[in-house]
Swiss-Prot record:
ATP binds at residue 235. Belongs to the class-I aminoacyl-tRNA synthetase family. TyrS type 1 subfamily. The gene is tyrS. HAMAP family: Tyr_tRNA_synth_type1. It comes from Porphyromonas gingivalis (strain ATCC 33277 / DSM 20709 / CIP 103683 / JCM 12257 / NCTC 11834 / 2561). One of its GO terms (molecular function) is ATP binding. This is Tyrosine--tRNA ligase. CDD domains: TyrRS_core.
Amino acid sequence: MNFVEELRWRGMIHDIMPGTEEHLNKGMTSAYVGIDPTADSLHIGHLVGVMMLRHFQRAGHRPIALIGGATGMIGDPSMKSAERVLLDEATLRHNQDCIKQQLAKFLDFDSDAPNAAKLVNNYDWMKDYSFLGFIRDIGKHITVNYMMAKDSVKKRLSAESSTGLSFTEFSYQLLQGYDYLYLYRNEGCRLQMGGSDQWGNITTGTELIRRKDGGEAFALTCPLITKADGGKFGKTESGNIWLDPARTSPYAFYQFWLNVSDADAEKYIKIFTGLNQDEIAELATRQAEAPHLRPLQKRLAEEITVMVHSREAYDAAVEASEILFGKSTTEQLRKLDEATLLDVFAGVPQYHVERSRIATGISLVDLLADATDIFPSKGELRKTVKAGGVSLNKEKVADAEQTVGEDDLLSDRYLLAQKGKKSYYLIIVE
């Protein structure tokens, strides 16, 4: 199966320029995907382009990841409703280094093979290009009529858009077009890939290559990822799902994939994993037979968490997930780092208690019925303890008068109280 056939069955092709597949079948070639460096981490919205490069390399071709250092200082108007914040060079370089470390989990940069991946930054070839030189060498080859016909430009100039379009952003497609020309000349790059909203910018590049060098270059885009319910992919109430564990814990990352709908799971597992058709078909059959077991979601969450983080991080995320369902021990609870602990218990009621009350030791009855109102009265607490219905840090409480001290704290500032089987309360000691 060739690269285009691979993407096609995975549902990863939106538009493809005629002749692309034939060109790829002739032998090894290079393709690039542009990556926005405005943060020091990729988020899952970037992963479709990254997976396209991964499949490209696995098919024997050479992937190029282009960090948009120069274009990131400007902002792409494609399908965005407002101009964006511009970044300085030091920040962009830092972000580039962080992004490369993440890309290395998907692409082989270090191989001696001729198709080893390469990372480039368009700031390196744009920073010394004078404005006069650029408009003379590049601007004269692309007409304003051609640029105005792009959907991204039309949308920003429409009556519905209150922001208009700055000249800076209008020039973006020329810069992206020049990137393609530069890589065509210097890296033998004949294909640019991206999301379907990038088609206009990509074809500006193929047109520039044709007009400047009389060359032939190609374009391929993937559909923008959506959710079955029409919601925005990759967003939660707390924002983006990042690949950096400091921004999104591996537990929260795992939970995001585990909780996608059945319809989305079948679509996403084709896009975001390397599982083959037979493996996915078998999972889909099992899902249809026993949807409550959610084999698609579980395998999707496993594959992508291991790829982005590690097998150890995945195992820890699964273990953390079991804590809410009563299958865990105090030892497992104590193994959680602070970020994961807060993610696991993000939705439970929280109480704040002064550290001085814990430092000297406080009885459980005073903690749960006086320092907090987890129990309405001390009598109610004692009765529930007697019935075996109270746990602290996943340990059943036998004595309502037991002392709770600093040694009991999780991550040195938390206590987890449990009433019955399902009611959790997080006590934060400050």
